[in-house]
Amino acid sequence: MQTFILAGGCFWCLDAVYRTLDGVQDVISGYIGGHTAHPSYDAVCTGATGHAEAVKVVFDEEVIPADVILDVFFTLHDPRQLNRQGADVGTQYRSAMFPADAEQEQLFRDAIARAGDLLDGTPVTTIEPLGTWHDAEDYHQDFFAKNPGQGYCNAVAVPKVNKVRKSFAQYVRAA
């Protein structure tokens, strides 16, 4: 098993997309990259904690390659936007990757370069020290599945899920 920690806007969207992929064993929403010891959602939303909303994606590389996990990441958010994704604005919504070791850091650098080759514009995605991971509150875990009628999810997460299902169809879980 391999674990990546990725931040790219609201963690509800990242969580929703990665849960659709075969080989993804777990997705945990949380906070990372800040200076507050025990961050809460309300505190992180202020932008004052330094933490990013992120997901911890645990996956089986024999089922889904690491490069695909990373290409999905760059498909489901706009890595050219600094400290925002759509209407979500602040450093808590930054595009960032948190490698566990030098091998992951190189995978992340290669993925940023691939994304840059495909985009009209340069990714602003940062590679940041791993630091301490903080699980988000329980109600944020698998939020999209638990709240299918929620307006934000319908407006923002559904199009991202559909885009990834189309672009990475061979890796989508069978229904």
Swiss-Prot record:
The keyword Transferase does not apply. GO terms for molecular function: L-methionine:thioredoxin-disulfide S-oxidoreductase activity; peptide-methionine (S)-S-oxide reductase activity. It is an enzyme of class 1 (oxidoreductase). InterPro entries: Met_Sox_Rdtase_MsrA_dom, Met_Sox_Rdtase_MsrA_sf. Its EC number is 1.8.4.11. The keyword Oxidoreductase applies. It catalyses: L-methionyl-[protein] + [thioredoxin]-disulfide + H2O = L-methionyl-(S)-S-oxide-[protein] + [thioredoxin]-dithiol; [thioredoxin]-disulfide + L-methionine + H2O = L-methionine (S)-S-oxide + [thioredoxin]-dithiol. It holds the Pfam family PMSR. HAMAP family: MsrA. Belongs to the MsrA Met sulfoxide reductase family. Has an important function as a repair enzyme for proteins that have been inactivated by oxidation. Catalyzes the reversible oxidation-reduction of methionine sulfoxide in proteins to methionine. This is Peptide methionine sulfoxide reductase MsrA. It comes from Clavibacter sepedonicus. The gene is msrA.
